[in-house]
Amino acid sequence: CIYANDLNPKFTGVGCARKIGMDEALRRFLHVNYDGIICCFDADSIVQKNYLTAIYNKLKSNSYAGASIYFEHPILGNSFKSAEYENIILYETHLRYYKNALEFCGFPFAFHTVGSSMAVKASAYAKQGGMNRRKAGEDFYFINKIIALGNYTEINTTTVIPSPRTSDRVPFGTGRAILDAL
């Protein structure tokens, strides 16, 4: 359990939360001298049963610094309004179109940068100075620092299912995009 109190409100947000957790994971890996894998995940996301084994199998013996993990937002159900499901379809289509356009143009660093679906080796995390404390976009900036190391990859053998929920806590990102579209 990690207990963090007296946090400066200027820095509290998803970036700060990820940083606290990832820094603690790094500390624990350093304590046992192990270059472990640090996974990022959102509390309201779900995953396939093979999530951990798929990540471990891809990153364990390879020289990969990190990976973007395949994701699909839910598009049907009773947990959210139909408009939220409709808007997440549009938003995710935009994300996939953007990444595919980068690939089509030959951009060598065309990866999804979704915070709930990324993993990084502890050594790469330390080498790049850890996670930033941004209130939004922390995943984008962090993943691009890891990609710059080279040997970044995708894991398409499992799926993260992030929530399509709205959010007014961040200036941009999935939750804000869904909220603004309603």
Language model segments and positions:
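Active-site donor/metal-binding and catalytic loop motifs
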Residues: I155-T174
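Terminal low-complexity segments of carbohydrate-biosynthetic enzymes
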Residues: L179-L182
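Active-site-proximal specificity loops/subdomain of glycosyltransferases
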Residues: C1-D35
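Acidic donor-binding loop at a coil-to-helix junction in glycosyltransferase catalytic cores
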Residues: R134-Y141
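Conserved donor NDP-sugar-binding/catalytic core segment of glycosyltransferases
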Residues: K49-I88
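Catalytic donor-sugar/metal-binding loop of nucleotide-sugar-dependent glycosyltransferases
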Residues: R134, I146-I161
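Acidic donor-binding/catalytic loop of UDP-sugar-dependent glycosyltransferases
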Residues: V32-G36, F41-K58
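A recurrent flexible, glycine/aromatic-enriched loop bordering the glycosyltransferase active site
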Residues: K99-A119
